[in-house]
A protein has these predicted regions:
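ATP-dependent adenylation/nucleotidyltransferase module used to activate substrates
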Residues: 1-185, 314-316, 320-329, 333-334
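AMP-forming adenylation/ATP pyrophosphatase catalytic core
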Residues: 142-334
Length: 334
């Protein structure tokens, strides 16, 4: 380290998931006098809510970037493939480090860090996975993993004296006992469970996403948010509907639907679900959607039911015989 570097504050930018490991990695570096800040990313698949909580708990400044466009470009064809569901963990982490590296370079930080622990996760935190992420981020020489540093090759930051390697840690494996002990040392009493908050690891959401990707090349954010709510049914190659399961579903569907191009269907005079048809559809599909809407309502099974159809320039009522849930099940996206 030069004299000039020794006299200035070293600045590090950390990727923060909001979990305990992220918090500890920042505090370990802050103990050395490094000025630490965090960066977190938002898409329709995950939010920065936990990272904001961690920032409040530790006083570490947090920057949140929205990266949906870049993420979708990666998600359609991840170089390392998907995990158990639609989760492209390795390419996701590489993208996040690349975006963090660009932010680091633009805002004068000295290096990047994360709370990753060698061997903690079987797919994304093996030694080969960490190397893959570093290589494909474009910032391999700027990434420090403080919690497992002593089990990994020495980084340029350590060689240059920007951080003291002897004060970094040698954690590895799936045991959480060392982290819990370290949390007690730092006075951290509240932190989320290590389970992730990414929708792409959810089996049901992933199936609905795969169906959307197979039938709609646009992948607009609104359609991605809709995947979280209701029963999704594929009526035809270009037509799907979403049927509310609960009152909360119904409220979310009514909030998220686009009245300029989507159709919203509800039974009139009887309790029933909110149904939306993204992008509308041909006449026969609208009638089928209305019949399914009636089938999930409190309407009599054997008589016609009035269903109001609004949106996409329409505001009218049609009468249909209900298609009952056991008949509609064949349309479910599973």
């Amino acid at each position: 380290m030069s004299l000039e570097e020794a006299q200035r504050t070293i600045r590090a930018l950390g990727l923060c998931s909001g979990g305990l490991d992220s918090m500890l990695s920042a505090l370990v570096l802050r103990d050395q006098g490094v000025h630490v800040e965090w960066i977190n990313f938002e898409t329709p698949f995950f939010s920065a809510a936990k990272a904001r909580q961690a920032a409040r708990a530790t006083g570490v400044p947090l920057h949140v970037l929205e990266i949906t466009d870049d993420y979708l470009a990666m998600l359609t064809a991840p170089r390392a493939g998907y995990g158990k569901n639609m989760n492209p963990c390795m390419d996701c982490h590489a993208l996040m480090f690349r975006k963090a590296g660009e932010y680091m370079r633009a805002h004068g930080f000295d290096f990047l860090f994360s709370g990753e622990v060698l061997g903690q996760r079987p797919m994304s935190q093996t030694a080969s996975s960490l190397r893959y992420v570093a290589k494909h981020s474009g910032f391999a020489d700027a990434i420090l993993r403080p919690l497992s540093a002593l089990r990994l090759p020495e980084t340029p930051m350590e060689q240059q004296g920007l951080v003291d390697r002897t004060r970094l840690l040698d954690l590895s494996g799936r045991s959480r006992k060392p982290q819990i002990a370290l949390a007690a040392h730092y006075g951290i009493t509240e932190y989320p469970a290590p389970a992730g908050g990414c929708l792409l690891t959810d089996r049901g959401y992933s199936r609905r996403l795969k169906d959307l990707m197979d039938h709609d090349a646009a992948l607009l954010p609104g359609a991605l948010h809709l995947l979280q709510h209701g029963r999704h049914m594929r009526l035809g190659p270009a037509t799907k509907i979403i049927v509310g399961r609960t009152q909360q579903d119904n409220e979310q569907l009514a909030r998220l639907y686009d009245p300029q191009q989507d159709l919203l269907l509800k039974t009139t005079g009887r309790p029933g679900p909110t149904v939306i048809m993204p992008g509308g559809g041909p006449r026969e599909m609208v009638y089928l959607a209305a019949a399914i809407c009636a089938g999930y309502s409190k309407a009599p099974e054997t008589s016609t039911t009035a269903v109001q159809v609004t949106g996409a320039g329409r505001d009218d009522t049609i009468s249909v015989l209900p298609v009952l849930p056991n008949e509609a099940r064949r349309f479910l996206i599973t």
